[in-house]
């Protein structure tokens, strides 16, 4: 798998299971633009770099209260990396 699109969750375990299991080349997290504390996200990146040194981790702020905004963000990522290369993981998201 090339690109995993994931909804960032406050629960760290929900953020790492799919990438560590599926081992994508790139993981793109859509996170709440109102999130102030980025320490957990930095720790997540460190975890991936230790376990999958070649992975690319991206984070995109979105208004998580708007389904329309979330859908538009997912579509932009899918267009950027070609939809056939993308997998959307929906079990997380706070």
Can you name each region flagged by the protein language model?
Residues 90-94:
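Active-site histidine-anchored catalytic micro-motif
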Residues 1-86:
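Long, low-complexity, Lys/Arg-enriched
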